[in-house]
C-alpha cells in the first residue's frame, strides 16, 4: 500500500494556521482609524453645549408679566372709613311728603331710617363738592310734651369727608361723638326734605 503525500507542506500549514488566528483575533493596532472616531461628534456636541452662555432668566417672566397686568387692572384702594353714630328725630307733619307716605305703612322709626340712608348718600356728595355749606341744618319736628321718637343708627364715613363735616359742625372740637352725629344726620335729612319742595321755607 502506497503512502499518500500530504496536500500542504509543514511550513504552509503553519502559515495557514497563523492567518486563521489573525482573522478570529484581529490585532488592535490594525483596526482602521475611523472606528475610533465614531463617538467624536457626540463629544464635540457636548462641549459646544457646555460652552453656550445661559439665557438670562430676567428677560421675560410670565409670572411677573401677569402680576403687572393684574395690578394695572385692579381698582384703586377704597378710602379709609370710620364708623359714625347718628341720631335724628322724625319731621313734623307736612315737612316731607316722602315721610308722610312711608309712615302710613311703616313705623316712624322705620320710615325715618329708610329716608336717612338715602339722605346720607346725597349728603356725602354735598360734603365732597362743598354745597353743604349753604344747605339747611335743621327741620321742624313735632311739638309734643311726650318723649319724641329718636332714631339711632351708625354708618361708615370716609375719613376725608368726616373731617370736613366735623370742621363745619364742630369747629371747636368740643362736641361729643353722639352730639356731632345728631347734627350730621339732622343736616342730611334737612337737605333731603328741602329738595322735595325747594320753595318750602321753614
Curated annotation (Swiss-Prot):
Keyword Glycosyltransferase (UniProt): no
Family annotation (NCBIfam families): PRK13862.1 (NF010436)
Record InterPro entries: Ribbon_hlx_hlx, VirC2, VirC2_C_sf
Protein's recorded name: Protein virC2
Keywords: Crown gall tumor, Plasmid
Gene name of the record: virC2
Record's compositionally biased regions (Basic and acidic residues): 36-56
Further remarks about this protein from its record: The Ti plasmid contains at least six transcriptional units, designated vir loci, which are essential for efficient crown-gall tumorigenesis. The translation of virC1 and virC2 may be coupled.
Keyword Acyltransferase: no
Lineage: superkingdom: Bacteria
Pfam families linked: VirC2
GO biological process: regulation of DNA-templated transcription
Region (Disordered): 24-56
Amino acid at each position: 500500500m502506497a503512502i499518500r503525500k500530504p496536500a500542504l507542506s509543514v511550513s504552509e500549514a503553519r502559515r495557514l494556521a497563523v492567518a486563521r488566528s489573525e482573522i478570529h483575533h484581529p490585532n488592535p493596532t490594525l483596526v482602521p482609524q475611523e472606528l475610533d472616531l465614531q463617538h467624536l461628534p457626540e463629544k464635540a456636541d457636548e462641549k459646544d453645549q457646555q460652552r453656550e452662555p445661559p439665557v438670562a432668566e430676567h428677560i421675560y417672566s410670565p409670572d411677573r408679566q401677569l402680576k403687572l397686568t393684574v395690578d394695572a387692572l385692579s381698582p384703586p384702594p377704597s378710602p379709609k372709613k370710620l364708623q359714625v353714630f347718628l341720631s335724628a328725630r322724625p319731621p313734623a307733619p307736612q315737612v316731607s311728603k316722602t315721610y308722610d307716605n312711608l309712615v302710613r305703612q311703616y313705623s316712624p322709626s322705620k320710615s325715618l331710617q329708610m329716608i336717612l340712608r338715602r339722605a346720607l348718600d346725597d349728603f356725602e356728595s354735598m360734603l365732597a363738592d362743598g354745597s353743604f355749606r349753604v344747605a339747611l341744618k335743621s327741620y321742624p319736628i313735632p311739638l309734643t310734651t311726650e318723649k319724641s321718637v329718636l332714631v339711632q343708627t351708625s354708618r361708615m364715613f370716609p375719613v376725608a369727608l368726616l373731617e370736613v363735616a366735623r370742621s363745619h359742625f364742630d369747629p371747636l372740637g368740643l362736641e361729643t361723638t353722639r352730639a356731632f352725629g345728631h347734627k350730621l344726620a339732622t343736616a342730611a335729612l334737612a337737605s333731603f326734605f328741602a329738595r322735595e319742595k325747594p320753595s318750602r321755607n321753614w
